[in-house]
Amino acid sequence: MRFILVSKYNSVNCENRKPRPSAVGRTNNKILTVKLLLTGSGGLIGSAVSEKLHGRGHELLKLVRRKSTDESELTWDPNHAGDLRDPRLNGLAGVIHLAGEPIAGIWSAAKKRRIHESRVRGSALLARSLAKLEQPPARLIIASGIGFYGDTGERKVDESEPNGEGFLAGVCRDWEAASGPARDAGIRVAIARFGIVLSGGGGALTAMLPPFRFGLGGIAGSGRQYMSWISLEDAARAVIHLLESESIRGPVNIVAPCPVTNAKFTLALGRELGRPTILPAPAFLLRRLPGGMADETILSSSRVVPGVLQGTGFEFEHPTVEEGLRNALK
């Protein structure tokens, strides 16, 4: 199911943006204090979302893989073949599913299998269980990634773009399809397709920082490939936006409105750190990473725009890469 965009691409000046008042905390539709279920609460995005939900006064029930420590946690095994059975799951206002094996790391055959299975099996278990509840939630937000589109070159793509090719495109396709039972049960499902989330506390940027801090950073490959990114602050706010909206369903690109080439990102990062960026990483060296990781991530071009977010009035706190990096590195 695809969301009908209000406009093809809302205009954003990505080069000469003037400062404006903070947009933090502003979304269009507010809901009352409610009880919510969250998975992946210990991850980069999950931690930020959890903090914002607590700040709004919402009651959180967290699904965790370890042994639960109090009534606010419920232990689960994403690989479980049955259903989740706990009376606390009834009457939830919404569910936010962010759990999954990290993409970062060496892509061995076992790692790639964990990336796929943790997402597909966990999502299927959750969707299946929610669909069978006597009082199912009204809304389910399930994470995915812009890897859904594959390598799209220099073309701007929004949520209407079809599924691409490659390992990550296949993972995202199966991941999103696993939410089918929830949709069939009448639950409003929004698919959050995350881009590169910029944070100094984890994720892709943290892995890039050591060489850049020592002045050893540079472009990857040709540097012409596009990177679709979003600040952690805006990513968490976007999840809240999906939760609080009564109309959004289907895929939603969680990216800033100003994707940049790897060359521009590299230059911006060097400027923020006050370091030179003159040592490139040739594509042939990057392709020595196992499992096709370089071609799927570092060298893949994704010029993805946030059509649904812009079409539903979401305001970005950090729309340009300079602002996103400055916020992440402060």
Per-segment meaning from a language model:
Residues A124-G166:
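Conserved Rossmann-fold NAD(P)-dependent oxidoreductase catalytic core, especially the SDR/UDP-sugar
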Residues L36-R56:
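N-terminal Rossmann NAD(P)H-binding glycine-rich loop of SDR-like oxidoreductase domains
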Residues R173, A185-I187, L198-A207, L242-V252:
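Glycine/proline-rich active-site loop of Rossmann-fold NAD(P)-dependent oxidoreductases
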Residues D295-K330:
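C-terminal amphipathic/interface module of NAD(P)-dependent oxidoreductases
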